Regions:
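An N-terminal, well-structured beta->alpha segment
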Residues: 1-66, 70-71, 153-179
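N-terminal small/polar loop signature for handling phosphorylated ligands or for N-terminal nucleophile
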Residues: 43-110, 196-262
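Short glycine-rich phosphate-binding loop at a beta-alpha junction
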Residues: 44-52, 180-183, 294-300, 337
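Proline/glycine-rich low-complexity loops and linkers
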Residues: 78, 129-165, 264-342, 346-347
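Glycine-rich phosphate-binding loop
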Residues: 95-109, 114, 240-263, 267-268, ...
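Gly/Ser/Thr-enriched, mixed-charge loops and adjacent short helices
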Residues: 110-242
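Gly/Ser/Thr-rich active-site loops/lids in small-molecule metabolic enzymes
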Residues: 202-207, 212-214, 267-286, 357-366
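Phosphate-binding and adjacent anionic-ligand microenvironments
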Residues: 248, 288-474
Length: 474
């Protein structure tokens, strides 16, 4: 029995994440495996278990399997997988599952992303904290002495070929013009999935010449952190795109569920532009099959170009709060064909409403390879506005800072709404800003967008000065 691990430190709102040996160890993971089965009622059912390339993922996978089989589940070990491979397997096999990963966090971290059968997300609102509480009890008091059901079995299965074939069935790249692409896997799971899906590792080759960067699976991340959201981590990819004269670059995060795109000039294409591009393609595809006004989900931080493109294409845009669980819930409720976030998470109805960066990347490749323009010109069409990006301010009184900003715009021709934080938008549509408090850190997050840089930049500077209680410099 252990009293050293406090699971409240590692169980977050949407997943589990902590430092190995401090807030997660094999004993704790075994207890989590047992609690996962008990809380979700999975005795006698199949549970899928996989992990990324982190040093502790294999050990944790085995520990989770011990706990799950002890409580009567039949475990299928998937080995090393990306997060979207788990979602695929959970949807395809209609089985609950987990993947051990800490995504883009540093090497000393690991964590767990969990799904119910059908790739349905598990969050604090749908059982994650119940699993935590029972696992803590098992950790403190020991697992029940005698299981009330026969122990389950353990088998092994590789889903990489099935996953690759399924993605290729959704986007046909066989007839595109030849493209040279640089892919930075960041020593993460993209080093396994890219050769399988886009290369010829398990299926016939495509008209793609792949220049690999950091495909070796290494959970110590020897080259750079596997977090493409940070511009510093894109520098090697940008340099390689220019060096090799590539048509585009792709950067995956550690568990390969997010993908960032670089054009032939070495410049990033925003996730909002990707969302708009993919949305237009998905709307056209399902309209051709007879679906009227297909729904596309986007969070309120994506560019206002997204709902404009969706509407123009004959779709119905639906805005939601920021966050994995909100998008997935809205995808299911609305029967949406596609959803996108500013953080480069892309959700597809045909992928069990789950997110997959690889499928989004395939849409970009299909769009680029289906015409002759370079990506910079193709992408510019979907990026008509100027965005500030997300800017964090460390503020103790987040509500007070927000109130000061609202007061600043009082009497001006603006609209204010409070779906997720506070959004202030010009009545003439020329700019908008959003202030959103972090739930876990003392940060107030600022996002903004304008018709031009000349419009949005002074507003950005004034708002940040008010938030930080400074005076803007002339």
């Amino acid at each position: 029995m252990s009293e050293e691990i406090d699971l409240s430190q590692s169980f977050k709102a949407y997943d589990v994440r902590g430092i190995v040996g401090q807030s997660l160890n094999a004993e704790a993971v075994e207890a989590i495996g047992a609690a996962f089965v008990d809380i979700l009622g999975l005795t006698g059912d199949t549970v899928l278990v996989g992990g990324d390339m982190r040093p502790s993922s294999a050990e944790f996978s085995e520990a989770f399997a011990r706990g799950a089989t002890y409580r009567g589940a039949n475990v299928v070990m998937l080995g090393q997988i990306s997060t979207d491979e788990l979602y695929f397997a959970s949807g395809q096999l209609d089985a609950a599952g987990v993947v051990f990963t800490a995504s883009h966090n540093p090497a000393q971290y690991n964590g767990i992303k969990m799904s119910k059968a059908g790739a349905l997300p598990i969050s604090s609102a749908t059982g994650l904290y119940d699993i935590r509480d029972l696992a803590q009890q098992y950790l403190d008091e020991g697992l029940p002495v005698s299981s009330d059901a026969p122990q389950g079995s353990t088998t092994r299965r590789d889903v990489l070929a099935d996953y690759s074939g399924y993605l290729r069935s959704l986007v046909d790249l066989s007839a595109i013009r030849p493209l040279k692409i640089v892919v930075d896997a960041g020593n993460g799971m993209g080093g396994l999935t890219t050769p399988a899906v886009l290369g010829d590792a398990v299926l016939p080759g495509l008209p793609l010449q792949i220049v690999p960067l950091y495909f070796e699976l290494d959970g110590t991340f020897p080259n750079h952190p596997a977090n493409p959201l940070e511009p510093e981590n894109l520098k090697d990819l940008q340099a390689a795109v220019l060096k090799h004269g590539a048509d585009l670059g792709l950067a995956f995060d550690g568990d390969a569920d997010r993908c960032f795109v670089i054009d032939e000039r070495g410049l990033p294409l925003s996730p909002s532009a990707i969302t708009a591009l993919v949305a237009v393609r998905e709307i056209a595809r399902v309209q051709a099959a007879g679906e009227a006004s297909p729904v596309v989900i986007h969070n309120l931080i994506t560019s206002k170009a997204v709902p404009e493109f969706v509407t123009r294409a004959g779709g119905t845009p639906v805005m939601t709060r920021v966050g994995h669980s909100f998008i997935k819930a809205e995808m299911a409720e609305q029967g949406a064909v596609f959803g996108g976030e500013h953080s480069a998470h892309y959700y597809f109805r045909d992928f069990y409403n789950a997110d997959t960066g690889m499928l989004a990347a395939m849409h970009v490749l299909a769009a680029l390879g289906g015409q002759d323009l370079p990506l910079s010109q193709l992408g510019a069409e979907y990026e008509p506005y100027v965005a500030t990006g997300e800017i964090n301010s460390e503020v103790e009184d987040k509500a007070g800072a927000t109130a000061r900003v609202v007061a600043h715009f009082e009497g001006q021709p603006v609209e204010i709404f409070t779906m997720d934080g506070t959004t202030i938008a010009a009545a003439d549509g020329s700019w908008w800003i959003n202030l959103r408090p972090s739930n876990t850190e003392p940060y107030l997050r600022f996002n903004g967008e304008g018709a031009t840089a000349e419009i949005i930049e002074p507003i950005r500077d004034a708002v940040l000065a008010i938030v930080r209680q400074e005076q803007p410099t002339d």
